[in-house]
């Protein structure tokens, strides 16, 4: 399978640089997986698409202000993007600099260069950085960090992004990118869903900066997926098994929820799904056998990205590419701050040949 099979033309003007004034007022393109039929509407139509007893699975990770600016004590500007917090004093990070710092190099971070840190080790493309400060890493980031807006949002971060680029139910700090499908849910919509009898459960997957890395190989099977930490606790497992037992659907909110649930299913020894607390490198592309997820709420993804591959594996390649073509024609807003899709599973997707 070639990466170029997942290319589509996207006019620059369709990339959303700001969210809608109201979270749930975005547009919703619904794709019926088995038939490929498309329906255009608004996000609140979700209320009519979900049944009492269906289970919505959200990712409750919280985005940290993971981008830091500063300089090496020896001179030379640097930009630090946290990949993950290792403990209260250390981070693993990407560092952009004209010359990469060496172990032992002192860093002065923050717009006023008031925070002292040391680059202690290098792990491939990532740098281990230790803060020489009494405060915890999270406190330091909250004080001097910038929100890590995706590279295709071509503007500096603003104070408003600290809330807008965050789901209303975010709880566990650790992500450097928002699980963006969740951005469309506001409290009134969540209340209406609960009132209808829709069940809710929360996994945690701390989205890493690797989510924005382009696929740099020609053949999909050669791609090595970045690693992210995920948690699928017992209560989620119980809720999934109960929904399946009563004939209801498990609906993942976002590709990160999909990857968490399907990672837990892959690792399960005795049941459909079991608790999972580990790093995952799951790479979902056409031919993948879904075990847990029956429907998916997701945003529109980048051409040739691992996420459009995940959607193609779920709805079928042809149905997915047709939906994206229609979305471009209908001028849907794309990517993190853009519009959403509601997709039901296509059991025939696994048999589809791509690029032949």
From Swiss-Prot:
It is found in: Cytoplasm. Its EC number is 2.4.99.17. GO terms for biological process: queuosine biosynthetic process; tRNA wobble guanine modification. Pathway: tRNA modification; tRNA-queuosine biosynthesis. InterPro entries: QueA, QueA_dom1, QueA_dom2, QueA_sf. It is an enzyme of class 2 (transferase). One of its GO terms (molecular function) is S-adenosylmethionine:tRNA ribosyltransferase-isomerase activity. Keywords: Cytoplasm, Queuosine biosynthesis, S-adenosyl-L-methionine, Transferase. Monomer. Transfers and isomerizes the ribose moiety from AdoMet to the 7-aminomethyl group of 7-deazaguanine (preQ1-tRNA) to give epoxyqueuosine (oQ-tRNA). Belongs to the QueA family. This is S-adenosylmethionine:tRNA ribosyltransferase-isomerase. It comes from Shigella boydii serotype 4 (strain Sb227). The gene is queA.
